[in-house]
Amino acid sequence: MEKFKAVLDLQRKHRNALGYSLVTLLTAGGEKIFSSVVFQCPCTATWNLPYGLVFLLVPALALFLLGYALSARTWRLLTGCCSRSARFSSGLRSAFVCAQLSMTAAFAPLTWVAVALLEGSFYQCAVSGSARLAPYLCKGRDPNCNATLPQAPCNKQKVEMQEILSQLKAQSQVFGWILIAAVIILLLLVKSVTRCFSPVSYLQLKFWEIYWEKEKQILQNQAAENATQLAEENVRCFFECSKPKECNTPSSKDWQEISALYTFNPKNQFYSMLHKYVSREEMSGSVRSVEGDAVIPALGFVDDMSMTNTHEL
């Protein structure tokens, strides 16, 4: 049991690194399956370029959209935004949150493109069908090279085609490593700038993360317990044809208040929207944004809180 707790603690401490590692492994594995099982270059001047680009970019686009769909912040931002009764966040704040979501969602597609470029098959197929690059690839080669170039991915036995494919694979791998280096540098820069502009110290940020984990866990347990009690009372009253007991549950407005995007204010340092809500008496009964509220990138994890719809009873 102690070992299991140690594993859980390790997972909590390094959840971001473990998450990115898992995404990288799954993306690399998916690309390997696509390139070896599904991908078959048509080897025609008409289809090589679009076929190669589709396999290189469309899965990346799908992973990008999936990254949005799997983010709790996305649904926190979108849920109820078209309702007349919903309170709209400022356009600048929403745009800033969308930019953060885009950067997070872009990790998997960039991984796909980088792995695909290192493997080289998609790039070889696409470039061999490009009429603009044909003169460059066929420079100093057989006069019929331009016409036979689209067939290069299917004629790997020919020496001339092997040379062209080797050249294309080398180019693809160079671009792949450049992309990987650029992504790593960008991640380090963003992380450094985010921490540099953090309004709280390193230790307070760690305390904040501990609080966030505990609040998320307790909210999940308490919500499941209250939902179970309410369901049991309603079912009991249905079968007994009796009136239900009074059950105090948060109103729709209450849920909207704690579901809003978190904003930081140095005058009132609340650790979550739930914390801000229960302290609302100090703020004239409202948790709406006030002057000084700001979206802080280093505190973006606060908006990742969500409740699952399954619970062991």
Curated annotation (Swiss-Prot):
* The organism's place on the tree of life at top rank: Eukaryota
Q: What triggers its expression?
A: Up-regulated in macrophages and dendritic cells upon stimulation with type I IFN, Poly(I:C) and LPS. Down-regulated by anti-inflammatory stimuli.
Extracellular-facing ranges: 38-46, 127-167
One Pfam family recorded for the sequence: Ca_hom_mod
* Tissues where the protein occurs: Immune cells in primary and secondary lymphoid organs.
Listed under GO biological process in this entry are:
ATP export; inflammatory response; innate immune response; monoatomic ion transmembrane transport; regulation of natural killer cell cytokine production
The record's annotation in InterPro entries points to:
CALHM (IPR029569)
Reproduce the UniProt comment on modification after translation: N-glycosylated.
GO cellular component terms attached to this protein's record: immunological synapse
GO MF terms listed in the record are: voltage-gated channel activity
Q: Where are the transmembrane segments?
A: 22-37, 47-68, 102-126, 168-190
Instruction: Give residue ranges on the Cytoplasmic side.
Output: 1-21, 69-101, 191-313
From the UniProt record, list the reaction(s) this protein catalyses.
Answer: ATP(in) = ATP(out)
**Keyword set, alphabetical order:** Cell membrane, Disulfide bond, Immunity, Inflammatory response, Innate immunity, Ion channel, Ion transport, Membrane, Transmembrane, Transmembrane helix, Transport
Q: Explain what switches its activity on or off, per the activity regulation comment.
A: Inhibited by Gd(3+). Partially inhibited by divalent ions Ca(2+) and Ba(2+).
Subcellular location as annotated? Cell membrane
Q: List the disulfide bonds.
A: 41-125, 43-154, 138-145
Q: Which family does it belong to?
A: Belongs to the CALHM family.
Can you state the subunit structure given in the record? Oligomerizes to form decameric and undecameric channels.
Q: What does this protein do?
A: Pore-forming subunit of an ATP-permeable channel. In response to pathogen-derived and proinflammatory stimuli, relocates from intracellular compartments to NK-dendritic cell and NK-macrophage immune synapses where it mediates ATP efflux and NK cell activation involved in antimicrobial and antitumor responses. May assemble to form gap junction channel-like structures with gating and ion conductance likely regulated by membrane lipids and voltage rather than by extracellular calcium levels.
Q: What is this protein called?
A: Calcium homeostasis modulator protein 6
The organism that produces this protein has a lineage beginning with: Eukaryota, Metazoa, Chordata, Craniata, Vertebrata
The gene is Calhm6
